[in-house]
């Protein structure tokens, strides 16, 4: 009788191992990461200008004035990007807080079902082999 119980235990152990190996794995939990925020580039600092020494002789007035732009007017300024319009933005593809508040699927019930099924099978094997 003792060997039959051990034999039933091994059969049930093999059955349980088979059932648990085929059990669906719990779904991985996803963490919601905020979308990356683009930081504006630092503002360009104007280059220090040196004052030219005073001219000894006046410049001729017949030459046209130089049309070189001043460095302060062409200095790039940091500005936020313009809105793209009614197109789909990356923010719309991200999950909303209502999606994040949904509870994750419970895989414990699935594993409990396999454990209960294994116990029922163990009882049946014990009754049949006894």
UniProtKB/Swiss-Prot annotation:
Q: Where is the signal peptide?
A: 1-21
Q: Which residues form the propeptide?
A: 107-130
Start-end of Pro residues biased regions: 33-68
Q: Does the keyword Glycoprotein apply?
A: yes
Q: Where is this protein localized, as stated in its record?
A: Cell membrane
Q: Which residues are glycosylated?
A: 24, 26, 28, 35-36
According to the record, the residues making up region (Disordered) are 22-108
Q: Which UniProt keywords apply?
A: Cell membrane, Glycoprotein, GPI-anchor, Hydroxylation, Lipoprotein, Membrane, Proteoglycan, Pyrrolidone carboxylic acid, Signal
**What name goes with this protein?**
Classical arabinogalactan protein 7
């Amino acid at each position: 009788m003792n060997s039959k119980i051990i034999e039933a235990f091994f059969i049930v152990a093999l059955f349980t191992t088979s059932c648990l190996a085929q059990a669906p794995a719990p779904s991985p939990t996803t963490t919601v990461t905020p979308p990356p925020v683009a930081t504006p580039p630092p503002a360009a600092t104007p280059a220090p200008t040196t004052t030219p020494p005073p001219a000894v002789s006046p410049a001729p007035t017949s030459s046209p004035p130089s049309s070189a732009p001043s460095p302060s007017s062409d200095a790039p300024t940091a500005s936020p990007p313009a809105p793209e319009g009614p197109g789909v933005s990356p923010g719309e593809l991200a999950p909303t807080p209502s999606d994040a508040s949904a509870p994750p699927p419970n895989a414990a019930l699935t594993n409990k079902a396999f454990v209960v099924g294994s116990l029922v099978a163990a009882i049946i094997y014990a009754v049949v082999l006894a």
